[in-house]
Amino acid sequence: MIALPPQPDLDLASLVRTIPDFPRPGIQFRDITTLIGDAVGFAESVRRLSACAAAYRPDLIVAVEARGFLFGAAMATAMGLGVVPVRKAGKLPGVTIGVDYELEYGTDRLELHEGAVLPGHRVVLVDDLLATGGTILATAALMRSVGAEVAAALFVIDLPDLGGSARLGAAGLRCETLIAFNGD
């Protein structure tokens, strides 16, 4: 295994590709595949997220489908912790527990394996991007429903103009991000 040295001066935002008008006109899609495709950039992202997470002393990393899995699994490995995937309904085999949450037009459901997170576990939630905050708030509600303590939610990218970070703060959920893309 090759351990890449820390790159504290690396501009992670420069490694995120912006695709205009995707998936529809007027949207600036922030594509992390260019960040994770760069070994140094991905390693530095994981190092920074892990350092943030370590300050909260979690028992587990909880990773949100789907790109949160990439960062959550790497962080958990770096920190010597387990990682628990939270998935959309019907994606996990076996007995699951879940929470329904509101979308702009309808509802969705998130699930995890029963017993994967236990009462008293201190967890850090991880996803790649924070937009409106709905998915991470639902994930936090799911964790609390099993008696876990949600220490914080961590993201690679925040789109503050969409209100997610403010919404999380208003809900009392600590939030940290590595990159913020304002406007455009």
Swiss-Prot record:
Pathway: Purine metabolism; AMP biosynthesis via salvage pathway; AMP from adenine: step 1/1. This is Adenine phosphoribosyltransferase. NCBIfam families: apt, PRK02304.1-3, PRK02304.1-5. InterPro entries: Ade_phspho_trans (IPR005764), PRibTrfase_dom (IPR000836), PRTase-like (IPR029057), UPRTase/APRTase (IPR050054). It is found in: Cytoplasm. Its EC number is 2.4.2.7. Homodimer. Keywords: Cytoplasm, Glycosyltransferase, Purine salvage, Transferase. Transmembrane segments: none annotated. SUPFAM superfamilies: PRTase-like (SSF53271). Its main location: cytoplasm. One of its GO terms (molecular function) is AMP binding. GO terms for biological process: adenine salvage; AMP salvage; purine ribonucleoside salvage. It catalyses: AMP + diphosphate = 5-phospho-alpha-D-ribose 1-diphosphate + adenine. Catalyzes a salvage reaction resulting in the formation of AMP, that is energically less costly than de novo synthesis. HAMAP family: Aden_phosphoribosyltr. Pfam families: Pribosyltran. Belongs to the purine/pyrimidine phosphoribosyltransferase family. GO terms for cellular component: cytoplasm.
